[in-house]
Protein backbone atom coordinates (compact mmCIF):
# COMPACT_ATOMS: atom_id res chain seq x y z
CA UNK A 1 0.00 0.00 0.00
CA UNK A 2 1.16 3.51 -0.79
CA UNK A 3 0.50 6.69 1.10
CA UNK A 4 0.19 10.09 -0.55
CA UNK A 5 2.97 11.17 -2.94
CA UNK A 6 3.77 7.52 -3.69
CA UNK A 7 5.72 6.82 -0.51
CA UNK A 8 5.11 3.25 0.65
CA UNK A 9 3.49 3.01 4.05
CA UNK A 10 6.16 0.52 5.11
CA UNK A 11 8.86 3.10 4.38
CA UNK A 12 6.97 5.79 6.25
CA UNK A 13 6.48 3.49 9.21
CA UNK A 14 10.14 2.49 9.11
CA UNK A 15 11.35 6.08 9.16
CA UNK A 16 8.99 6.84 12.04
CA UNK A 17 10.26 3.82 13.96
CA UNK A 18 13.89 4.82 13.46
CA UNK A 19 13.09 8.35 14.60
CA UNK A 20 11.31 7.07 17.68
CA UNK A 21 14.18 4.74 18.51
CA UNK A 22 16.64 7.60 18.14
CA UNK A 23 14.59 9.76 20.47
CA UNK A 24 14.43 7.00 23.07
CA UNK A 25 18.21 6.57 22.83
CA UNK A 26 18.89 10.32 23.02
CA UNK A 27 16.65 10.85 26.04
CA UNK A 28 16.87 7.52 27.83
CA UNK A 29 20.52 6.60 27.38
CA UNK A 30 22.88 9.23 26.04
CA UNK A 31 21.54 12.12 28.13
CA UNK A 32 22.47 10.05 31.20
CA UNK A 33 25.72 8.56 29.86
CA UNK A 34 28.09 10.76 31.83
CA UNK A 35 31.73 11.03 30.76
CA UNK A 36 34.93 12.63 32.00
CA UNK A 37 36.96 14.54 29.44
CA UNK A 38 40.70 14.83 30.19
CA UNK A 39 42.88 17.51 28.61
CA UNK A 40 46.38 18.87 29.21
CA UNK A 41 47.10 22.58 28.92
CA UNK A 42 50.70 23.91 29.02
CA UNK A 43 50.22 27.27 30.76
CA UNK A 44 52.22 27.11 34.02
CA UNK A 45 55.68 28.57 34.68
CA UNK A 46 58.69 26.34 34.12
CA UNK A 47 59.64 24.14 37.03
CA UNK A 48 56.19 23.90 38.62
CA UNK A 49 54.25 20.73 39.28
CA UNK A 50 51.05 20.01 37.32
CA UNK A 51 47.77 21.40 38.66
CA UNK A 52 44.50 19.46 38.29
CA UNK A 53 41.38 21.52 37.61
CA UNK A 54 37.87 20.08 37.50
CA UNK A 55 35.47 22.08 35.34
CA UNK A 56 31.76 21.46 35.91
CA UNK A 57 29.23 23.25 33.74
CA UNK A 58 25.58 23.31 32.70
CA UNK A 59 24.36 20.88 35.33
CA UNK A 60 20.74 21.99 34.66
CA UNK A 61 19.57 20.07 37.72
CA UNK A 62 15.98 18.82 37.73
CA UNK A 63 14.36 17.25 40.78
CA UNK A 64 14.66 13.47 40.79
CA UNK A 65 17.87 13.16 38.74
CA UNK A 66 19.48 10.60 41.05
CA UNK A 67 22.02 9.27 38.57
CA UNK A 68 23.33 12.75 37.79
CA UNK A 69 23.57 13.58 41.49
CA UNK A 70 25.54 10.41 42.23
CA UNK A 71 27.88 11.01 39.29
CA UNK A 72 28.58 14.60 40.33
CA UNK A 73 29.27 13.48 43.88
CA UNK A 74 31.69 10.85 42.59
CA UNK A 75 33.83 13.49 40.87
CA UNK A 76 35.23 14.47 44.26
CA UNK A 77 37.18 11.22 44.08
CA UNK A 78 39.36 12.80 41.38
CA UNK A 79 40.84 15.01 44.12
CA UNK A 80 41.26 18.13 41.98
CA UNK A 81 43.39 21.02 43.18
CA UNK A 82 40.41 23.28 42.58
CA UNK A 83 37.01 23.36 40.87
CA UNK A 84 35.66 25.79 38.26
CA UNK A 85 31.87 25.96 37.88
CA UNK A 86 30.87 27.80 34.70
CA UNK A 87 27.17 28.18 35.42
CA UNK A 88 23.66 27.10 34.41
CA UNK A 89 23.29 24.90 37.47
CA UNK A 90 19.49 24.74 37.39
CA UNK A 91 16.68 23.71 35.07
CA UNK A 92 14.11 23.42 37.84
CA UNK A 93 13.59 26.09 40.50
CA UNK A 94 12.63 23.37 43.00
CA UNK A 95 15.90 21.47 42.53
CA UNK A 96 18.21 23.75 44.53
CA UNK A 97 18.49 21.31 47.48
CA UNK A 98 19.35 18.46 45.11
CA UNK A 99 21.87 20.62 43.27
CA UNK A 100 23.66 21.52 46.50
CA UNK A 101 23.59 17.88 47.58
CA UNK A 102 25.11 16.83 44.25
CA UNK A 103 27.87 19.43 44.45
CA UNK A 104 28.39 19.04 48.19
CA UNK A 105 31.56 16.91 48.03
CA UNK A 106 33.09 19.29 45.45
CA UNK A 107 32.37 22.27 47.69
CA UNK A 108 34.98 20.84 50.07
CA UNK A 109 37.64 21.76 47.49
CA UNK A 110 38.77 25.29 46.62
CA UNK A 111 36.75 26.67 43.75
CA UNK A 112 35.52 29.59 41.66
CA UNK A 113 32.26 30.15 39.82
CA UNK A 114 30.22 32.31 37.48
CA UNK A 115 26.51 32.08 36.76
CA UNK A 116 24.58 31.57 33.53
CA UNK A 117 21.11 32.70 32.55
CA UNK A 118 19.49 29.52 33.88
CA UNK A 119 20.81 30.21 37.35
CA UNK A 120 18.83 33.44 37.41
CA UNK A 121 15.73 32.41 35.44
CA UNK A 122 13.79 29.21 34.91
CA UNK A 123 13.82 27.74 31.39
CA UNK A 124 11.04 28.52 28.94
CA UNK A 125 9.55 26.20 26.34
CA UNK A 126 11.27 26.98 23.05
CA UNK A 127 11.09 25.48 19.58
CA UNK A 128 14.49 23.80 19.07
CA UNK A 129 14.36 24.78 15.39
CA UNK A 130 14.86 28.40 16.44
CA UNK A 131 18.52 27.71 17.11
CA UNK A 132 19.00 26.68 13.48
CA UNK A 133 16.88 29.57 12.23
CA UNK A 134 19.00 32.06 14.18
CA UNK A 135 22.14 30.54 12.70
CA UNK A 136 20.80 30.75 9.14
CA UNK A 137 19.80 34.36 9.75
CA UNK A 138 23.27 35.14 11.08
CA UNK A 139 22.04 36.01 14.56
CA UNK A 140 23.60 33.03 16.35
CA UNK A 141 21.90 33.90 19.62
CA UNK A 142 23.29 37.43 19.53
CA UNK A 143 20.03 38.84 20.86
CA UNK A 144 20.54 36.74 23.93
CA UNK A 145 18.11 34.74 25.93
CA UNK A 146 16.68 37.70 27.81
CA UNK A 147 13.90 36.47 30.09
CA UNK A 148 10.43 36.89 28.70
CA UNK A 149 7.60 38.47 30.64
CA UNK A 150 6.47 35.98 33.25
CA UNK A 151 9.75 34.06 33.36
CA UNK A 152 10.34 32.26 36.64
CA UNK A 153 12.94 33.98 38.81
CA UNK A 154 15.08 31.36 40.50
CA UNK A 155 16.26 31.78 44.08
CA UNK A 156 19.80 32.04 42.76
CA UNK A 157 20.92 33.79 45.94
CA UNK A 158 20.60 30.45 47.75
CA UNK A 159 23.11 28.92 45.35
CA UNK A 160 25.42 31.92 45.65
CA UNK A 161 25.27 31.86 49.43
CA UNK A 162 26.05 28.12 49.58
CA UNK A 163 28.96 28.47 47.18
CA UNK A 164 30.31 31.48 49.05
CA UNK A 165 29.95 29.76 52.43
CA UNK A 166 32.07 26.87 51.15
CA UNK A 167 34.84 29.28 50.21
CA UNK A 168 34.30 29.29 46.46
CA UNK A 169 35.11 32.64 44.86
CA UNK A 170 32.27 34.50 43.15
CA UNK A 171 33.72 35.87 39.89
CA UNK A 172 30.67 37.86 38.78
CA UNK A 173 32.28 40.73 36.83
CA UNK A 174 35.18 40.71 39.26
CA UNK A 175 38.57 39.20 40.06
CA UNK A 176 39.76 36.69 42.63
CA UNK A 177 42.76 34.56 43.62
CA UNK A 178 43.53 31.07 44.81
CA UNK A 179 46.84 29.81 46.18
CA UNK A 180 47.48 26.27 45.00
CA UNK A 181 50.57 24.46 46.27
CA UNK A 182 52.50 27.72 46.38
CA UNK A 183 51.21 28.96 43.02
CA UNK A 184 49.25 32.20 42.83
CA UNK A 185 46.40 31.68 40.35
CA UNK A 186 44.41 34.80 39.46
CA UNK A 187 40.91 34.68 37.97
CA UNK A 188 38.85 37.25 36.12
CA UNK A 189 35.20 36.43 35.64
CA UNK A 190 32.21 37.79 33.76
CA UNK A 191 28.49 37.52 34.32
CA UNK A 192 26.59 35.83 31.50
CA UNK A 193 27.01 37.50 28.07
CA UNK A 194 24.00 35.52 26.80
CA UNK A 195 21.68 37.85 28.69
CA UNK A 196 24.01 40.84 28.41
CA UNK A 197 25.10 40.87 32.05
CA UNK A 198 28.82 40.91 31.22
CA UNK A 199 30.68 44.08 32.21
CA UNK A 200 34.23 43.66 30.99
CA UNK A 201 35.00 47.31 31.63
CA UNK A 202 34.91 46.55 35.36
CA UNK A 203 37.73 44.03 35.10
CA UNK A 204 39.70 45.25 32.07
CA UNK A 205 43.42 45.74 32.30
CA UNK A 206 44.89 42.33 31.69
CA UNK A 207 46.36 39.63 33.92
CA UNK A 208 47.88 40.44 37.28
CA UNK A 209 51.62 40.58 36.79
CA UNK A 210 52.49 39.00 40.15
CA UNK A 211 50.34 35.90 39.54
CA UNK A 212 51.77 32.63 38.26
CA UNK A 213 48.71 32.10 36.04
CA UNK A 214 45.69 34.20 35.08
CA UNK A 215 42.45 32.56 33.92
CA UNK A 216 39.38 34.12 32.31
CA UNK A 217 36.07 32.53 33.32
CA UNK A 218 32.69 33.09 31.62
CA UNK A 219 29.53 31.07 31.06
CA UNK A 220 28.71 31.75 27.39
CA UNK A 221 31.71 31.98 25.03
CA UNK A 222 30.58 34.98 22.99
CA UNK A 223 33.33 36.38 20.80
CA UNK A 224 33.25 39.78 22.48
CA UNK A 225 34.24 38.16 25.78
CA UNK A 226 36.82 35.84 24.24
CA UNK A 227 38.31 38.74 22.27
CA UNK A 228 38.55 40.90 25.39
CA UNK A 229 40.23 38.23 27.51
CA UNK A 230 42.62 37.23 24.74
CA UNK A 231 43.57 40.76 23.67
CA UNK A 232 44.34 41.56 27.30
CA UNK A 233 46.76 38.62 27.42
CA UNK A 234 44.95 35.88 29.35
CA UNK A 235 46.58 32.52 28.49
CA UNK A 236 43.56 30.38 29.47
CA UNK A 237 39.78 30.90 29.17
CA UNK A 238 37.14 28.51 30.53
CA UNK A 239 33.50 28.57 29.39
CA UNK A 240 30.38 26.41 29.03
CA UNK A 241 26.88 27.16 27.68
CA UNK A 242 27.03 25.40 24.30
CA UNK A 243 26.15 21.87 25.50
CA UNK A 244 28.62 20.81 22.81
CA UNK A 245 25.82 21.34 20.30
CA UNK A 246 23.66 18.83 22.25
CA UNK A 247 22.16 17.24 19.12
CA UNK A 248 25.07 16.47 16.82
CA UNK A 249 25.48 14.54 13.60
CA UNK A 250 27.89 11.59 13.78
CA UNK A 251 31.10 12.18 11.78
CA UNK A 252 30.04 15.79 11.22
CA UNK A 253 29.56 17.42 14.59
CA UNK A 254 27.49 20.24 15.99
CA UNK A 255 24.99 22.28 14.03
CA UNK A 256 24.71 25.17 16.50
CA UNK A 257 26.52 26.71 19.48
CA UNK A 258 23.73 28.97 20.80
CA UNK A 259 26.13 31.92 20.54
CA UNK A 260 28.42 33.43 17.91
CA UNK A 261 31.25 30.94 18.50
CA UNK A 262 31.93 28.71 15.48
CA UNK A 263 30.88 25.08 15.66
CA UNK A 264 34.47 23.83 15.25
CA UNK A 265 35.11 25.01 18.82
CA UNK A 266 31.76 24.04 20.32
CA UNK A 267 33.42 21.86 22.96
CA UNK A 268 36.82 20.81 24.21
CA UNK A 269 40.20 22.50 23.99
CA UNK A 270 41.06 24.92 21.19
CA UNK A 271 42.70 28.33 20.81
CA UNK A 272 41.43 31.86 20.36
CA UNK A 273 43.32 34.76 18.77
CA UNK A 274 42.72 38.47 19.25
CA UNK A 275 44.80 41.61 19.62
CA UNK A 276 48.02 39.86 18.68
CA UNK A 277 47.64 37.26 21.45
CA UNK A 278 46.61 33.61 21.52
CA UNK A 279 44.75 31.97 24.41
CA UNK A 280 43.89 28.39 25.20
CA UNK A 281 40.10 28.06 25.22
CA UNK A 282 38.23 25.21 26.87
CA UNK A 283 34.48 24.99 26.32
CA UNK A 284 32.69 22.37 28.40
CA UNK A 285 29.87 20.45 26.76
CA UNK A 286 28.25 20.33 30.20
CA UNK A 287 26.43 17.54 31.95
CA UNK A 288 22.79 18.56 31.62
CA UNK A 289 20.06 19.77 29.29
CA UNK A 290 17.04 22.02 29.49
CA UNK A 291 14.13 20.24 31.16
CA UNK A 292 12.13 20.90 27.97
CA UNK A 293 14.67 19.24 25.65
CA UNK A 294 16.12 16.42 27.78
CA UNK A 295 17.99 14.78 24.90
CA UNK A 296 21.54 14.50 23.63
CA UNK A 297 22.80 12.79 20.51
CA UNK A 298 26.45 12.15 19.55
CA UNK A 299 27.34 14.49 22.41
CA UNK A 300 27.31 12.78 25.82
CA UNK A 301 27.19 14.84 29.03
CA UNK A 302 30.56 15.51 30.58
CA UNK A 303 32.80 17.23 33.06
CA UNK A 304 36.45 17.97 32.32
CA UNK A 305 39.63 17.35 34.27
CA UNK A 306 42.21 19.81 32.98
CA UNK A 307 45.82 19.11 33.89
CA UNK A 308 47.76 22.37 33.76
CA UNK A 309 51.44 21.77 33.03
CA UNK A 310 54.55 23.94 32.57
CA UNK A 311 54.87 25.67 29.23
CA UNK A 312 57.05 23.99 26.62
Segments predicted by a language model, with ranges:
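Core catalytic region of metal-dependent phosphoesterases/phosphodiesterases
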Residues: 67-179
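Acidic/histidine-rich helix-loop elements
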Residues: 50-69, 90-92, 121-132, 251-262, ...
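Membrane-penetrating hydrophobic segments
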Residues: 1-15
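Beta-strand-turn-beta hairpins that frame and shape the catalytic cleft
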Residues: 42-54, 168-169, 175-187, 213, ...
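Active-site environment of divalent metal-dependent phosphoester hydrolases
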Residues: 61-66, 90-94, 118-125, 146-147, ...
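N-terminal active-site segment of His-dependent metallophosphoesterases
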Residues: 12-14, 18-102
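Conserved beta-sheet core of the metallophosphoesterase superfamily
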Residues: 221-304
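Active-site neighborhood of phospho(di)ester-bond hydrolases with catalytic His/Asp-centered motifs
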Residues: 54-57, 82-88, 111-117, 171-173, ...
